Amino acid sequence: MGTIDWRLAQHVGELVSGIAGRGWATPPASSVGELRINPESLNAPELASRITAYTGLDPTDGVPALEPVDRPRWIAANLATMRPLLEPLSERMGGGLGPLSGMARSASGALIGVQVGALTGMLSQRVLGQYEIALLDPNPSPRLLLVAPNLAQAAQNLGVDREELVRWVTIHEVTHALQFGGAPWLREHLAGMLRELMDSMQIEVGKEGAGGLRDLLALSGIDGRPDVSAMREKLADLISKARNGELLRITLGEDRWQLVEQMQATMSLIEGHAEHVMDAVGA
């Protein structure tokens, strides 16, 4: 059994998803219903046919149905995808604890939970859509997610038509579905690099880290009401480290960072191709 506290990860993720800039704000009022995304009107299969005609990418299994979600559900979906990635790491970490107490084991699992929750919470503020695929687990079906509150907020900030924005984002994400479905080697290529990264990853909880973790756990209100004003500064620092890659770099070590850069290069190619297809097909 893994040691990662996934309940804490979801809790911290939802707290972080409400942070705006340096201050604390409630999540946007726009809900899935208020955005009124009608997946059927977007006609993802028809868009997929147009993308196939332009790119030659033809997935054998078609494309997933579009799913409008809010931030908590987006966080939950991504945490579920992370489980097969991080549970083996937590098992290795747990096996290395030896005679340490159950409290130390719980602290280690909570540390990963806080970090993963903060990362997904931060990303949940920015993601408009996502082709969600589990690279290391072939069993879950891929999903096409549209993050309704973020789409509503982006349309308002940019002063553009909501329906047009949703359509463009849909084209982008359907393109990702065809990239992976039409080029099966791509998934295994990324999965191979990811496996190597996860096999090399180590987590250690020192006294200093455990003290900071205890502070975060106390402030997060996992057992009661969160101390929002006090938690803001600590989470802002954690998010800052996540944004500049410091957390991941420390966790992996410099000798494995080259793999991260290789994955980033591959993802840049995938994203650039999707942007090109979006402009060509959506015009």
Which stretches of residues belong to each language-model region?
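Acidic, low-complexity proline/glycine-rich segments
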Residues: G2-L15, L128-V147, L235, I239-A242
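Auxiliary, metal-adjacent structural segments of Zn-dependent hydrolase domains
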Residues: N43-P149
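Short, solvent-exposed segments of well-ordered alpha helices
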Residues: S31-E34, N38, D161, W257-E261, ...
